[in-house]
Amino acid sequence: MQLKAFSVSEVTEYIKKVMDNDIILRNVRVRGEISNLKYHSTAVYFTLKDEGAALKCVMFNDYSRSLEFTLQDGMSVIATGRITVYEKGGLYQLYVQSVQMDGIGALYIAFNKLKEKLQKEGLFDLDKKKPIPKHPRKIAVVTSPTGAVIRDIITISRRRNPTVDIMVVPVLVQGSSAADEISNALRILNKRKDIDVIIVARGGGSLEEIWPFNEEKVARSIFASRIPVVSAVGHETDFTIADFVADLRAPTPSAAAELVVPDIKVYQRELFLLKTKIMNLMKAQVLHSKKEFEGLKRALYLNNPIKKNEVLKQRVKNLKKSLTKEMLSIFNQKKNELLVLNEKLDSLSPLKVLTRGYTIVLNKEGQVITSSRKVKTSEEVGILFSDGRATAVVKEVKEDGERI
């Protein structure tokens, strides 16, 4: 008996009916590693593989938009959907309706692989961290517009310094679109000139929920930002790739507000100390200037020509008085000395002897004849008396012992 020959379409249609009616294949969960991941306008195409086989998969956008994370090659996942035949290609494939990561271990593997990659590229280097401004005027907060995170940041910021402007940039913080929204927000903010610092924040959650902050595109957007970025994701013990790339990591969103927004009380205290310092400097300067002024005033007074003239006049007067007194003293002293000398001279004067009856004999030259040997006979001599003189002629000269 000859078997009936079926057309390709008939066989394919039969296989499709069998698979579509299979209770297991209509709703099946398949574990495998993603490969050959491709995004198209209407769907995401990839292959699930393990050590022994491979399964083509397609996930239409209506389903992929609800993903809590972004699909990546090498990621271990569990895909849920229905397996049927794609008739035109003659292929059976899994039409995926949902995808979940295959355990926390797979996420940690992906986390560590990306961390190692970015670290080798230098995205975590400390010397590439930008300093957080000490006195920001405007802070952009990239986070969900609702919930405790943004409320806490705004409350703490207003309490610490109400003059700081907080700009809320609303984005999804979980789901497959979150990474794109966060990256776009950072790119747009970097076009502005009025933003001093950016806080990227979300509250705590599971590793799957905070996974957008472990996405490579978010990490690279943070690194490329010219504006300093502070990451504040999850709880204190949660670490994301964003934390390593950011210029500063805050343990919580509330802590980010504490770290970035300066306390106005500190401003006021610093202002008071600065004011006190300025006042002390001014007082010291005034005191110094006053001393200098007094010194200049005194110097001007002493160097004043009129004052100098008065001083000189007084000095001349004092010198004149002193000189007169000194001269009078010297005059009296010399006068007394002269009187004493005069008395001595008078007592020794030959004329004084004449008053006692003696005479002095003089030769023609008026010289005193002190010896008989100095006179000759017939020589004319002068005789000096106390009250006059006379002329005589020597008649005879005798030596001592001879009588005249």
Swiss-Prot record:
Name of the protein described by the UniProt record: Exodeoxyribonuclease 7 large subunit
One Gene Ontology MF term: nucleic acid binding
Family (UniProt): Belongs to the XseA family.
Cystine connections: none
EC id: 3.1.11.6
Catalytic activity, reaction form: Exonucleolytic cleavage in either 5'- to 3'- or 3'- to 5'-direction to yield nucleoside 5'-phosphates
Subunit structure: Heterooligomer composed of large and small subunits.
GO cellular component annotations of the record: cytoplasm; exodeoxyribonuclease VII complex
InterPro entries (alphabetical): Exonuc_VII_L, Exonuc_VII_lsu_C, OB-fold_nuc-bd_dom
Biological classification of the source: Bacteria, Bacillati, Bacillota, Clostridia, Thermoanaerobacterales
Keywords: Cytoplasm, Exonuclease, Hydrolase, Nuclease
Known role: Bidirectionally degrades single-stranded DNA into large acid-insoluble oligonucleotides, which are then degraded further into small acid-soluble oligonucleotides.
The keyword Manganese appears for this protein: no
Main subcellular localisation: cytoplasm
Subcellular location: Cytoplasm
Swiss-Prot/TrEMBL GO biological process terms: DNA catabolic process
